[in-house]
Amino acid sequence: MALEEELDEERVEEAKRMWNGVPLSFDQEKMIKWYTEERGGARGGADVFYLMFGITYNCQLKCPHCCVGNYENEPPRELTTDEIKDVLDQSAKAFVINFFGGEPTLRQDLMELIKYASERSIYVFVDSNGIKITKDYAKQLKDNGLEMLYVSIDSPHPEEHDRLRGMKGLFDIATQGIKIALEAGLRCELSTYVTKETLANGDFEKVIQLARDLRATGVRYTLPTPTGRWLNNPEVMLTREEERKLRKIAKFPFVCRDFYFQNQSSSQCAGMSGHAYFYISPYGDVMPCCFIPLTFGNIREEPLKTIIERMWGHHMFSEDWVNKECPMLNKGFRERYIHTIPGGTKLPFRMC
């Protein structure tokens, strides 16, 4: 039976208009089906489109640009399998659950969590450094319902990628992992970040070409942002001229920016402007984004829906920067909400 025959015709047409030109990481038919069901009230739980779910801070590497590198790391406090499943049940309206780290593949229950989410018609993504992606592991990911694997590639040059991540031979391991994932039938994108240097010397374009050579699904990129281990380094940010150059290089939909509405008529952050995205830490802290070290509650203490409503109702989300770029790129936002956090405070900082 055709999709249009299964679902309300008016809502299908609305969904097609809204999601015209989605990133290659999304299956458009599944997105339309999700949108019509969610708008039609067929799903229950908290309102969310994309949940970035940190399930561990543990990682084999220690990258200087890690966006969660300055968060408190106490493995015994990590959410249990049952606690994560409870959050997934509370997130039944979600289109995407993106398991994030640290390195998610270090959790022994990852396959169980992927299966649990996919059985609830949630689209499951996983971010990885690629170290554990063997043929057997990729098959398990596929068999349990993983839809998209993001593998980090920081540089097109093997020795530079290895240096940045502190592990010799990692580039070859990661690119081999990408090939294995694709052969297993998984969608697999290269995940990278842009810097002033890689934009100027052409390395970002070479990462895109590497993705094409590997026949990857696409490239997801992040702008250099003063967060994580870069929290006190605003000089990493691109200038407006550099951003214009980047937009000319990053040809959508093969190349897309993370966590942004991608209809190309807008560059608004999906979290701050659309309330469509948020982050949960491995310890249950609910945050607007993994880049923003502020928490509005913990799922061990309150229902997810209650925390989300409190978070999006906070006055910071009605202020000037909301309909603009990532707030962590905004000097006024950082000065008002980040630089006022008392020194020595463990992050993320509790807002209420």
Regions found by a protein language model. Give the residues of each.
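Conserved alpha-helical substructure of the radical SAM core
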Residues: 2-145
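Flexible mid-to-C-terminal extensions adjoining Fe-S/redox cofactors in radical SAM and related proteins
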Residues: 2-19, 24, 30, 34-35, ...
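Short, intrinsically disordered, charge-biased short linear motifs at domain edges
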Residues: 44, 48-54, 253-258, 274, ...
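Conserved, mostly hydrophobic/aromatic
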Residues: 59, 63, 284, 304
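Short cysteine clusters
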Residues: 59, 63-66, 269-271, 289-290, ...
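A short acidic, helix-capping loop that chelates divalent metal ions and anchors anionic groups
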Residues: 72-74, 157-164, 227-233
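Radical SAM/AdoMet-radical enzyme domain recognition
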Residues: 81-100, 107-222
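A C-terminal junction/extension of Radical SAM enzymes
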Residues: 187, 203, 218-288, 331-336
